[in-house]
Amino acid sequence: MNHRHFQPVFAFLITLAAAAEPEHHSADIVVYGDSPSSISAAIEAAENNTDVLLVSPVRHFGGIIANGLGSQDVDKRAGNAEPIGGLTREFFIRIARTYDHDATSPRYKFHSSRAGQAIDHWLAEKNILVLRNKRISEKPGSVTKEGGCITGFTCEDGTRISGKVFIDGTIEGDLMAFSGVSYTWGREGNDQYGETVGGVINPTLEQQFHFKVDPYNIPGDPSSGTIFGVQNEPVGTHGSADKSAMGFCLRLPLTKDPENKIPVTAPEGYNARDYELYRRFLAAGGGNDWLDGPGNKNDDRKAKLIDLGSWHELSGNFYGRNHGYPDGTYAERKRIYEEHRGYTQGLIHFLSTDPSVPVEIRAEWSQWGLCKDEFTDNGGWPRMLYLRSTRRMVSDYVITEADVIARPASSQCGRTLQPAPPVEDPIGVAWWFVDLHAARTVIKEGRVYNEGAFINYDNYAPFGIPYRSIIPKRADCTNLLVPSALSSSYAGYGALRLEWTYMVLGQSAGAAAVIALDKNLPVQDVPYPDLAAHLVSRGQKITVSKAGN
């Protein structure tokens, strides 16, 4: 037999087998996510000469910082820049250097494209192995564990990732959830942790309509159904639990510059009746600095707005339209993103063109458009929503409202909440208040009513974030750290949900992972004195000198 005739066949079969073999990557420390905590965790591990792999479910790193949130909550009401040290401070200095190469101070207001540029350069400089568009598979068994330790996970495209210590840097807590770690979402009732604003907030005073807006399709007729954007459900009892989440939005950079502007046209399927709530609000005499138009009316024709935020009774937050997101499938999250994007596009078109909108508002909005030089692969639209609250781990320490307040707080039901004592294992400092946006737009006494907003500017203090809040219960997993979807109540998370806080916790998670790896310890057994000493040596701030409010 002439075996030479079979050689091409054998070579072809070998090639097919190689092509069918799934991609596999392994590292001592695996960081999963695209958020700021993912970046700082990976860089902290790399700068400690550790074998680290950074796996992102999407193409672009930075999370919402690289997707529209260009105005950071730093040195606004709180004067809270003091806790920003270590890699977090370095990151904001690196952003400043994309504007001024010689900058030595951090910059907290910037364009998203500059943040993305700074992140990509930083990761390349550290020679970190980066995998993009590698999302964990939703199929059962995609995360494998042995003896309480994660051994690896499989991505949607079949790529296999293995490691010794894992860090879940996603805001959504996907690796955490798929690993079987205890978590929750939505709003706990006040009774669960003895809080005063843990669940439904009734009455809601913040972000509330101060003009009566009729909620029914035929004004005054409940049988006619509700106008779009109003949920026909009861407000609920103060302090009761539910699965709501504060409203999401798109954080939009916008411009007036004709050479850089993408006009915002009506989306497919646009129907002006979907914005009846806005029409009635304006007709009743309502208004705010969001609806009046982006930026400053005196901005010149080259003006570029860094970040169109939403924190008003009526703006770009679509209360009640996101409740399926936190624990939803990837398909459900995509649907919610697309709904928010389409509705935002339609809203801008409505405010720019609809005859019911006051002429001065139409004139202002019609000058603005999306930016050609932002999100160039997505038509000028941010690639993600601003996720104010999703999943939250439930661990041995749950950060609650008591950790945030400086003085006793009282609730409508007569409960008085005492401040929690300082924690013994701080790995960073949170310096913000309980900051909850509305979660639902419902009906109360025959009028449109926003429920769920609570912002306490007057009773908060900087507080140490305990190491225990970023590690799971020992029975759940012993080699995972969770710096973004950390263990907290809904109210407690309201003081944690700042991007710079995530980045602080990411660095601390990276440092703890290195120690756990070097000492061959479960993350629950990392010696806190060793971790604290290391963090301080790296410029991390784990205590502050100021007392707060």
Model-derived segments and spans:
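Bacterial N-terminal signal peptides
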Residues: 7-17
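Bacterial Sec-dependent signal peptides at the C-terminal "C-region" and cleavage site
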Residues: 16-24
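Beta1/beta-strand and adjacent pyrophosphate-binding region of the FAD-binding site
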Residues: 24-35
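N-terminal Rossmann-fold NAD(P) dinucleotide-binding loop
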Residues: 38
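Aromatic pocket-lining residues of Rossmann-like dinucleotide-binding sites
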Residues: 45
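Conserved N-terminal/central alpha/beta ligand/cofactor-binding core
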Residues: 50-51, 56-142, 184, 192-194, ...
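Conserved beta-strand-loop-beta-strand element in the redox core of flavoprotein oxidoreductases
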Residues: 140-160
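Flavin (FAD/FMN)-binding glycine-rich loop and adjacent Rossmann-like elements that form
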Residues: 159-165, 169-549
